[in-house]
């Protein structure tokens, strides 16, 4: 029995190494006092008005950091946004000054909260592949990453950059 278990674990490890495990799709980058956990975007066809991206960022450094922006190959640069309404997915406000990350803290960009709103998609972002991109920080500068492209979730918000900014401006004038 122990030999069978060892063989099974070895096979599981080999399959995981080849990408046969959903958990193995998660990836991270450690650099300049930051740990970037599983940056990802929703799949989008070329010509789409935009797509959204998410990541979890842990500041392991001793100084505060600030996320300022992002880029992805295949779409216009991102705008940092936060949701302002739990019932209206298009009610977003632009975070013009970025998002602070205190030393030892973790920033979670996730659907329905804060995220990256990429503009016009000029190259198909197909599901289950990676796209080159960057995250831009105040102290760490430009950090090269790969965004994993995931299917659009039926629960996830569908955004248009113009609609998001209009909603933000409308809420600011009330």
Question: What are these model-predicted stretches?
Answer:
Residues 20-26:
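Sec/Tat signal peptide C-region and signal peptidase I cleavage site
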């Amino acid at each position: 029995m122990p030999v069978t278990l060892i063989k099974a674990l070895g096979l599981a490890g080999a399959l995981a190494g080849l990408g046969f495990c959903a958990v193995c799709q998660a990836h991270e980058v450690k650099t300049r006092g930051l740990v970037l956990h599983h940056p990802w975007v929703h799949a989008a066809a070329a010509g789409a008005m935009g797509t959204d991206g998410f990541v979890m960022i842990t500041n392991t450094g001793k100084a505060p950091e600030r996320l300022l922006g992002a880029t992805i190959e295949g779409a216009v640069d991102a705008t940092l946004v936060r949701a302002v309404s739990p019932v209206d997915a298009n009610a977003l406000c632009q975070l013009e000054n970025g998002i602070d990350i205190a030393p030892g803290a973790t920033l979670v960009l996730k659907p329905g909260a804060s995220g990256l709103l990429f503009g016009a998609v000029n190259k198909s972002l197909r599901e289950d592949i990676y796209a080159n991109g960057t995250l831009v920080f105040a102290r760490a500068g430009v950090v090269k990453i790969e965004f994993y492209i995931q299917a659009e979730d039926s629960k996830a918000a569908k955004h248009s950059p113009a609609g998001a900014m209009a909603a933000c401006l409308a809420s600011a004038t009330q």
